[in-house]
Amino acid sequence: MEKDVVSLQDALEHGLTAEEFQKIQEILGRIPNSTELGIFSAMWSEHCSYKNSVLKLKTLPTSSDKLLAKAGEENAGAMDIGDGLAVVFKIESHNHPTAVEPYQGAATGVGGIMRDIFTMGARPIVSLNSLRFGNPDEPRNKYLLSRAVKGIGDYGNSLGIAVSGGELFIDECFSKNPLVNAMTVGIVRHDQMASATTGGQVGNAVYIVGATTGRDGIHGASFASKDLSKESESKRSAVQVGDPFMEKLLMEASLEAIQKGLLIGIQDMGAAGISCATSEMSAKGKTGMKIDLDLVPFRETGMNAYEVMLSESQERMLVVPKKGKESELVSIFEKWNLNAVRIGEVTADGFIEIYMGGKLKAHIPAESLVLGGGAPRYERETKRPSYLDAVKTWKPNSILDITPGANTKDVLLNILSSWNVCSRKPITEQYDSEVGLVKLIGPGLDGGLSSIPDTNKALATATDCNSRYTYLDPYKGAQFAVCEAARNVYVTGATPYGVTNNLNFANPYIPENYYMFSECIRGMGDACRFLGLPVTGGNVSFYNESPEGPIFPTPTIGMVGILQDKKKFLSNFPKEVGIELAVLGNFRPSLGGSEYLKKIHGQVNGSIPEIDIKEELELCKLILSLNEKGALKSARDLSLGGIGIALSKTILFSGLGIDAELIAFKQSRLDLTLFGESSTTVLVGFDSSWKEKIREQTEEKGLKFYPVGKTTSSELLKLKDIGVEVSFSELNGPYEKGLEVVFAL
């Protein structure tokens, strides 16, 4: 055994605590060497071990009769969708790498989540991304956003995977710490699902396949587990470098090997690289592995064991083939011009045994390294932030109301131009949403809807979180995120199936931050339980803060749903003249946390909209029932920007006009009526012959029917009772120009 003895100071510099260093010595029965310390530091980092979050995550609902792979069991969640098929999906972050090197940081985030899907045997069919950036008027933020979007587009387009949707949210708190959350969804037959395990098959060979190994990404896992600082800019070596064309070859070769039944197990080498893949596969299979690092294909010379074990070079997999299938495995990967090299074997003793240069470099129990095994687990101290009570003292009468006529029109156009409302075309046009011929409802609308190849089914997808809401009220804000994601799925006509989450928070050792995290988990869990939605997995990203302060808490919700008959999909907007419009649900608007309050008055304040999850469930059932009966022509979520923005976007997407009267929506203030935001509300379109039946069925559910008006051929938004008339061109100008400056050549 190599004995370059390390000290407590070395451990602290690797991000371990004194207590953790002591625990490592107890596990090994000795002081670790430098390679072993590096392995423990990566595997016990927040990024890999979830040590400060796993106890909270265990409170989330994870049960469903449709589940095929529960949270934490595999690389991604898997759910039965009928006919022998499963949907496989997951969301993950690449926040800190994007802050340092936005193009590669965002691109490799896409690559990593793609590998999580196809290592399970599923072919990715759509991807989404949820982005948070600072004000693009500032040059650095503009650079980060534009380069991140290009990285996402270039990588995904090269793989040939359609983008079905996503979201962008802009706020100053994300200036030094942007968020890039990437989600991928794939489809697989039940009998072709793969697992990240050795399968207990002692003596089987272990192969590394795909790209060569270099020094890129070393310390990537630990880099993602620290606060961003002024020195972070120098940590570019911790950012991985991606090759999407290599990933495409790796995907095809891996899927071919899986479909031909050659493999016992397969694992992506993402965070912590070989360290993670060997330990996780071994622990799951209750075995060990003996690995010779001299056999690893290198792209750089002079790498030592520490560097090889911690390298996060992209587009690599660790596979355990079935005995007798090794040559066939190698032939497949060689056909795709990829490496497939035997580097070791599965052992019975449960230890990860690493050799290089003929010397034993590491000897560690696999179970001691992994989440759910020997990795530490903590529940941190919480303290309710004092500002949460202060913001609730804000009253709408502290700001001037808008007045009917020109003032209202000006405010409407101003909100339409805001970063969080305006057109996403400058972003979505960089993504290929048509590849694979699966798009039914594309990016830029409430939720995406894509055909599932060779079936009559369609897949609905959405990502959602209003970061201002969770900042103002973490419990209700997280509930709102779950409900809005579900709403954006069911307005396509699809039934919500399951949730994946990306929990973006600040330093968990600060009690106020951990309180926000805990409350968001509680809110998310309560909402998912009531809606009957299992949480199938996801990602936790702590330490999202800079010297200027923490980000807003952002528990991004990824949602999938299934429409059994894709011919019954619902449009986001009406397509004919004379269609009746109404809002179904319970309109309880609030200006607290609204886009109006931020854009027009420069404030993030107040109480966020009330939310009743029982009503949300009833509204979901109502929309799905009405659609099944053929009663609806369109449906869209009513949230950011209120009824005023929802009607404006309906005109912009349909090219029609709307004659509306908002008497049924009238509140004590005009700004509250037009721009107040509400949960549990959907704007629907229908033929007039259905009006009374829809009203009756809505009221039977304990919900309300709010008549709006009709579509016209005028291309005008007429709010008759408010005295506002706005043309398509007047709406379109500010809406389209909002993000153009960011992506202008």
From Swiss-Prot:
Annotated active site: H47, H94
Binding site residues for substrate: S93, H94, N95, H96, R115, Q240, E312, S313, Q314, S541
Positions that bind Mg(2+) 1: E92, N539
Any one GO biological process: 'de novo' IMP biosynthetic process
An example Gene Ontology CC term for this record: cytoplasm
Residues holding ATP: Y50, K90, N501, G538
EC code: 6.3.5.3
Pfam families referenced in this protein's UniProt entry, alphabetically: AIRS, AIRS_C, FGAR-AT_linker
Protein location: Cytoplasm
Residues reported to bind Mg(2+) 2: D116, D268
Pathway annotation: Purine metabolism; IMP biosynthesis via de novo pathway; 5-amino-1-(5-phospho-D-ribosyl)imidazole from N(2)-formyl-N(1)-(5-phospho-D-ribosyl)glycinamide: step 1/2
Cited InterPro entries: PRibForGlyAmidine_synth_PurL (IPR010074), PurL_linker (IPR041609), PurM-like_C_dom (IPR010918), PurM-like_C_sf (IPR036676), PurM-like_N (IPR016188), PurM-like_N_sf (IPR036921)
GO molecular function terms noted in the UniProt entry: ATP binding; magnesium ion binding; phosphoribosylformylglycinamidine synthase activity
Principal subcellular localization: cytoplasm
Keywords: ATP-binding, Cytoplasm, Ligase, Magnesium, Metal-binding, Nucleotide-binding, Purine biosynthesis
Catalytic activity: N(2)-formyl-N(1)-(5-phospho-beta-D-ribosyl)glycinamide + L-glutamine + ATP + H2O = 2-formamido-N(1)-(5-O-phospho-beta-D-ribosyl)acetamidine + L-glutamate + ADP + phosphate + H(+)
Source species, domain of life: Bacteria
Record's keyword annotation contains ATP-binding: yes
Purpose: Part of the phosphoribosylformylglycinamidine synthase complex involved in the purines biosynthetic pathway. Catalyzes the ATP-dependent conversion of formylglycinamide ribonucleotide (FGAR) and glutamine to yield formylglycinamidine ribonucleotide (FGAM) and glutamate. The FGAM synthase complex is composed of three subunits. PurQ produces an ammonia molecule by converting glutamine to glutamate. PurL transfers the ammonia molecule to FGAR to form FGAM in an ATP-dependent manner.
UniProt similarity note: Belongs to the FGAMS family.
UniProt xrefs under HAMAP family: PurL_2 (MF_00420)
Oligomeric and partner information: Monomer. Part of the FGAM synthase complex composed of 1 PurL, 1 PurQ and 2 PurS subunits.
NCBIfam families listed in its UniProt record: FGAM_synth_II, PRK01213.1
Protein name: Phosphoribosylformylglycinamidine synthase subunit PurL
Gene that specifies this protein: purL
